[in-house]
């Protein structure tokens, strides 16, 4: 965010504040050009136009996901929780996963809509998926792939081909029987991969935003590393939010805002009481 460069945290530290929970929230990026999300991203509109294409949300759905070893590594239904997904992907080789679906699933998303809408939208239908993905690839998006065979897909992505084909065969059997014995994904999200072209998009961990920095107590008073109160100094919001470590609680939407709102109220009230208190 323009203008937010850590001045408040640095001033508090210079005043003797302890440091606590200084971290970046772990989040996931799926089906987007990760190179466009590195460096100066202050112009969010420009970044979004470069990183995302209209078909990006199709790679944020609960379809088959594998790592570079060609293995599934989590229940794809949990992709809806960016924290769970990012933590799982971060443990894989090269910290990357691949969501894969075929032409039949693409038609489903075009005609009936996505399983999960990933943003505020008036429709969940995604038109012209094949054309949009091919255009993104032609424009230089190195995180999306189109292939006419699984061998070709493996060659493009670097996934181990034999393992990928074995996983797809096992997954297709689960789709046919309606029973996922590996991760017990619900039948509604079991869709086979048999009809080319095959589409893949990378899933990578990324930083959602900074958290923590200033150590406070339950009265929002700033304290030193030894928990000694610094009189008259209060802090609130994300600069003092150390309740998540590196994993935001996506199952409780708005909780960062809730902490900011209420810690700000508490800090304001306590600072007012401090100013009004008799000297000495």
What are these regions (language model features)?
Residues 1-36, 251, 257-266:
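Glycine-rich loop(s) and the adjacent beta-strand/alpha-helix scaffold that form part
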Residues 27-32, 78, 82-85, 205-211, ...:
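Glycine-rich phosphate/pyrophosphate-binding beta-alpha loops
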Residues 41-88:
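Phosphate/diphosphate-binding loops
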Residues 71-118, 229-245:
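Gly/Pro-rich active-site capping loops and adjacent beta-alpha segments
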Residues 91-198, 270, 274:
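Helix-rich C-terminal "cap"/substrate-channel and partner-interaction subdomain
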Residues 149, 163-247:
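A glycine-rich dinucleotide-binding beta-alpha-beta segment and adjacent secondary-structure elements
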Residues 223-224, 228-278:
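Catalytic phosphate/nucleotide-handling subdomain of diverse soluble enzymes
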